[in-house]
Amino acid sequence: MPIWVDADACPVPIREILCRAATRWQIQTTFIANHAISLPPSPHISRRQVPHGFDVADNEIMDQMSKGDLVITQDIPLAAEAIEKGADVFNPRGQAFTKENIRQRLAMRNFMEEMRNAGQVTGGPAPFSQGDRKEFADQLDRWLQRNARK
């Protein structure tokens, strides 16, 4: 049950947590990005650099992942596709995307995009915090305990 990381927007502290977990649990973790990223050497950690372009990294993740894999992404449409294919998905803040909540998350994303395009909303998400880091680490640990030894 490998882990696939949409690494283009993955915060460095989350990459570090994932790398430590990959080594500790000996679980294959692949970071996919359209730019070079720094990762520690490990037989359990790999990176794939894809060309720049719309959804290129997303498409690579979808082509490679399988049912039961874990996908880490902030991209809600990618999360929806991965869930449809049977993956477990959560974002770098540790929030799980599920069959039960993904439609609502997509609707909210689309609504906020419309509001931004209309100039009604100008801000983005809150800055990444220590609490977000802890929530992610806890969520990852729970997933690994359930899935890594299967």
UniProtKB/Swiss-Prot annotation:
Listed name of the protein: UPF0178 protein Maqu_2186
Species: Marinobacter nauticus (strain ATCC 700491 / DSM 11845 / VT8) (Marinobacter aquaeolei)
A UniProt-annotated Pfam family: DUF188
NCBIfam families: PRK00124.1 (NF001095)
Superkingdom: Bacteria
Family per similarity comment: Belongs to the UPF0178 family.
Signal sequence annotation: none
PANTHER family xref list: UPF0178 PROTEIN YAII (PTHR35146:SF1)
CDD domains, per the entry: PIN_YqxD-like
